[in-house]
């Protein structure tokens, strides 16, 4: 996808409410946020603060109860599930906290899963996967199954998968929670390198303050409310 | 890269429970089908081969060939009925045949015929010569041999082979009417028929004539002493035919249903295990339809592989079964089972559809 | 109870399993019922007649209907030492008119008071004079007092008695005197010069065992084959081939039941490994988990059994098999024990898996969820 001059992500008064019986839980309370087309934003907060919910809404995995969500010019807040599926396929990339690689697929095949579900050119997709594997220093491990890879290598495959569909926005959930400090730093460097190289925007959710210096801007979220922490 | 096929290839043991169950069920289905076909062919071969659209019986025989008697006068009446083109006499006797060099006797049905049935040459020139059904080869019968029939050991010699001409599960022997009368007189002196009397008549109708109408006309012309039916009606009236068909089909249909349930259960359990992966797939943009297509593809592949192995199993079982058990495998029955298995497998996998649709992609991230 | 709560929360899974097992059990039961009814329909009449030794012509291949003996051979058999009573037995299939309908019956003619008469009657009395007959009552085609004639005409026979489980060659049977048999055969085929008996029914003299007598008859009269009644029933045409075919079908069905039960409970157990490990870690003894599993197995098998028996009753009423299907409770009980026993054997593997769970695995598991 080309670069859009407009914001990669715009949240306007987004609110997410869960109802169970008579009780009401407000996961996100009137959050507003704007992420530039090549900006990296870190979202920091304790568990239960709503940061994962906010990430899900930004990526079209959840619809907000109220408010507008605009990703690279597409207003997705009103999309039905089918349209949201297409949106996710074409416009965003995810890196999940629990890696979530398919255990019976090789590293390369795990990358190709993303383009398998779209009507993209198979040869181009394969070339792209190989290129990503090289950039992530995984060429030697391209034909290995996840159980044959180290924790750090698996995380790198997951990062590569997020870029396979050339997204406008990459959403990353706790990338370093399962890794030690040194490995965590390596993965964050890799993520930032890839994001910068492609001019993509990224929102990284983390509770690890040591990693926030990788982002252009850090925001705090507590009990569903977004505030400003010091920018880096 | 097809996800479904890759999983089948890389994790085959995962699918073992369903495959093993379906292999055995295929074996069951093919064996059931083979028994049904074998029984049907072995009972009805001789009648199915008869020339002409109609068969005329004595009306008091309840469509039994063996108990039917049609005398020369009645035959003449039948020949004169308009719409009748050709009439031929047919007779049979069921008895045991002693085969040279064999300890067990074979059960045979000796036929005397005027008009050659399909696949059978004209009656042999000499009395005492017969064609033998190829199923008798399993009992050690060879061309050129002389078989001794009945308690008085009447000799007949085999001068050629015919196939699919058995009657009531007894091996068909086909000779001229003289041969038949002589054997009848030798083996069953209390059942002999006067010269010119046959058991049934095979009747061909003229072109353009309606067989049902001609049948009615024949029975009217003989004053109700005959019962004329179409050949297929006669075949279905042989003892046990319709009952075998309904019984076996009930068991076969139940077995197909079991296959569907086994596949359904298997994929329900598999889908439960895959909820995590499926949520991730949906998060990166896979639709429920695409995921479900993978499930259906796996169900079809499992059915196909199970069928092939099951067919080998059935063939092995068939080889071990003694010739007295009327088991006949045919390509059309095999195709029927294969298609049925694929359809049932697909239907079974459809039970997981709702579960796949309900998977929420948001769970991938939490 | 955790076990039943799990079933209640996942009705589809357990429903499918109970349904599949139930249908398979039904297949086993139905085929078993079919088999015993078929075998009885082939040879019930033979079993029910009084001759404990039956003598056929030797080329008849143990087939009563294919056997025919000349009267002098009957005489020779009767004079073999060890013979208590001997009498000619006629067997033939005939078309008769009963209640205005043409039906095929197996006609068995025996001399009154001599071997070959039916031994057990359900009502009425044996045929003592020409023109009287005893009918097997399964098909309800006959009632006491009915008059039966051959389709070819001839003197009528009045039903004076009824018996059960006495069919022959899957046809209703009519037991008449030998004279009636002869006259009905002549009426059906006027061309016949004479009517010969099909076999000789023999009761050994006191102190002589049937098998010994059969052997002596074989030795003394070369043109015949003598069989004890048990051998005649076992060797009748269709019996061994039917038994062989059904053996294959029943074996396959029973193996599938055991496999399906075993495999699927194993899968269910493996899927619960995380939860089970947790239970062990918080102190639940292994026996508690195994008991839970077995409770589920018993519940599922119980439901399956109900489904199977229900279908069996429906099927025996509804399917047109052409022969009276009687559910044999003893055979059913044996089949049930075999099927349930094998299923439990299949489940043993799942039990072993449960016992193998190591509570330490609860600690250090990277999270209960996720894929790796």
Predicted feature residues:
Chain B
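Hydrophobic secondary-structure segments that place a key small or acidic residue at a functional site
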Residues: 90-93, 98-187
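Membrane interfacial helix motifs at helix-loop boundaries and amphipathic/re-entrant anchors
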Residues: 35-45, 49, 62-64, 230-250, ...
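Transmembrane alpha-helical interface segments in multi-pass membrane proteins
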Residues: 29, 277-322, 336-344
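Hydrophobic alpha-helical transmembrane segments of multi-pass inner-membrane transport and secretion
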Residues: 12-39, 243-279, 300-309
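Mechanotransmission and gating elements of multispan inner-membrane complexes involved in transport
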Residues: 153, 162-255
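Hydrophobic, regular-secondary-structure patches
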Residues: 26-106
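A short amphipathic helical element positioned immediately N-terminal to and/or at the very start
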Residues: 1-9
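C-terminal membrane-exit region of the final transmembrane helix in multipass inner-membrane proteins
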Residues: 3, 337-366
């Amino acid at each position: 996808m080309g670069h859009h001059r407009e914001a990669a992500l715009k949240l306007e008064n987004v609110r997410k409410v869960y109802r169970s019986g008579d009780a009401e839980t407000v996961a996100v309370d009137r959050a507003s946020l704007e992420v530039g087309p090549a900006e990296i934003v870190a979202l920091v907060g304790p568990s239960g603060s709503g940061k994962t919910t906010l990430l899900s809404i930004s990526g079209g995995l959840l619809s907000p109860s109220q408010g507008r969500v605009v990703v690279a010019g597409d207003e997705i807040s009103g999309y039905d599930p089918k349209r949201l599926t297409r949106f996710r396929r074409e416009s965003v990339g995810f890196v999940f906290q629990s890696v979530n690689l398919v255990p019976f697929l090789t590293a390369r095949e795990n990358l190709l899963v993303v383009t398998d579900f779209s009507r993209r050119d198979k040869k181009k997709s394969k070339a792209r996967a190989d290129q990503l594997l090289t950039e992530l220093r995984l060429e030697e491990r391209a034909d290995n199954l996840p159980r044959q890879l180290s924790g750090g290598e698996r995380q790198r495959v997951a990062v590569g998968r997020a870029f396979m569909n050339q997204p406008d926005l990459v959403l990353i959930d706790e990338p370093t929670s399962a890794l030690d400090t040194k490995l965590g730093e390596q993965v964050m460097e890799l993520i930032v390198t890839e994001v910068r190289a492609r001019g993509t925007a990224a929102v990284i959710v983390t509770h690890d303050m040591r990693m926030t210096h990788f982002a252009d801007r850090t925001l705090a979220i507590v009990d569903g409310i977004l505030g400003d922490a010091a920018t880096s | 890269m097809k996800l479904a096929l890759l999983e089948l290839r890389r994790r085959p043991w995962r699918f073992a429970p369903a495959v093993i169950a379906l292999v055995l069920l295929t074996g069951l289905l093919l064996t059931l089908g083979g028994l049904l076909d074998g029984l049907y062919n072995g009972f009805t071969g001789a009648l199915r081969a008869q020339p002409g659209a109609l068969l005329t019986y004595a009306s008091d025989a309840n469509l039994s060939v063996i108990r039917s008697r049609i005398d020369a006068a009645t035959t003449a009446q039948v020949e004169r009925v308009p719409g009748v083109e050709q009439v031929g006499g047919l007779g049979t006797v069921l008895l045991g045949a002693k085969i040279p060099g064999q300890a067990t006797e074979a059960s045979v049905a000796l036929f005397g015929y005027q008009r050659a049935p399909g696949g059978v040459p004209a009656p042999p020139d000499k009395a005492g010569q017969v064609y033998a059904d190829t199923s008798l080869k399993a009992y050690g019968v060879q061309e050129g041999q002389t078989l001794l029939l009945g308690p008085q050991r009447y000799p007949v010699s085999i001068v050629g082979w015919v196939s699919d001409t058995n009657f009531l599960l007894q091996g068909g022997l086909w000779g001229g009417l003289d041969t038949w009368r002589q054997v009848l007189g030798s083996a069953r002196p209390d059942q002999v028929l006067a010269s010119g009397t046959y058991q049934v008549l095979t009747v061909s109708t003229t072109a353009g004539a309606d067989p049902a109408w001609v049948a009615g006309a024949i029975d009217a012309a003989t004053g109700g002493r005959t019962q004329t039916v179409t050949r297929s009606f006669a075949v279905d009236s042989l003892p046990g035919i319709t009952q075998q068909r309904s019984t076996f089909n009930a068991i076969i249909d139940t077995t197909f249903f079991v296959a569907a349930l086994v596949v359904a259960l298997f994929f329900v359990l598999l889908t439960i295990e895959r909820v995590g992966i499926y949520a991730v797939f949906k998060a990166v943009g896979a639709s429920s339809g695409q995921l479900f297509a993978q499930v259906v593809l796996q169900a079809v592949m499992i059915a196909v592989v199970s069928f092939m192995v099951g067919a080998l199993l059935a063939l092995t079982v068939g080889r071990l079964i003694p010739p007295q058990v009327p088991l006949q495998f045919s390509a059309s029955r095999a195709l029927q089972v294969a298609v049925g298995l694929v359809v049932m497998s697909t239907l079974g996998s459809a039970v997981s559809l709702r579960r796949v649709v309900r998977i929420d992609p948001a769970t991938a991230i939490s | 109870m955790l076990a039943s709560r799990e079933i209640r929360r996942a009705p589809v899974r357990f429903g499918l399993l109970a349904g599949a097992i139930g249908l398979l059990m039904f297949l086993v039961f139905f085929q078993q019922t079919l088999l015993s009814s078929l075998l009885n329909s082939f040879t019930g009449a033979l079993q029910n007649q009084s001759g404990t030794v039956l003598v056929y012509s030797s080329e008849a291949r143990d087939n009563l209907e294919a056997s025919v003996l000349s009267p002098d051979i009957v005489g020779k058999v009767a004079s073999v030492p060890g013979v208590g009573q001997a009498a000619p037995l006629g067997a033939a299939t005939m078309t008769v008119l009963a209640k205005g309908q043409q039906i095929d019956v197996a006609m068995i003619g025996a001399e009154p008071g001599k071997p070959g008469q039916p031994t057990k009657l359900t009502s009425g009395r044996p045929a003592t004079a020409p023109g009287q007959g005893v009918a097997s009552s399964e098909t309800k085609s006959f009632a006491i007092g009915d008059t039966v004639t051959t389709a070819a005409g001839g003197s009528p026979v009045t039903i004076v008695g009824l018996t059960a489980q006495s069919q022959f060659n899957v046809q209703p049977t009519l037991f008449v005197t030998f004279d009636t048999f002869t006259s009905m055969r002549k009426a059906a085929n006027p061309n016949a010069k004479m009517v010969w008996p099909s076999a000789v029914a023999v009761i050994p003299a006191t102190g002589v065992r049937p098998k010994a007598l059969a052997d002596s008859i074989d030795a003394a009269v070369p043109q015949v084959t003598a069989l004890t009644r048990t051998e005649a029933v076992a060797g009748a045409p269709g019996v061994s081939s039917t038994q062989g075919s059904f053996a294959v079908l029943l074996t396959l069905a029973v193996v599938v039941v055991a496999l399906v039960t075993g495999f699927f409970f194993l899968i269910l157990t493996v899927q619960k490994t995380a939860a089970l490990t947790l239970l062990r870690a918080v102190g639940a003894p292994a026996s508690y988990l195994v008991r839970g599993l077995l409770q589920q197995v018993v519940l599922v098998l119980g439901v399956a059994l109900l489904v199977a028996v229900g279908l069996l009753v429906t099927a025996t009423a509804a399917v047109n098999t052409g022969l009276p299907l009687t559910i044999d409770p003893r055979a059913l009980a044996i089949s049930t024990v075999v099927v349930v026993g094998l299923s439990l054997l299949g489940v043993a593997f799942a039990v072993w898996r449960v016992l193998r769970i190591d509570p330490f695995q609860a600690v250090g598991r990277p999270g209960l969820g996720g894929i790796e």
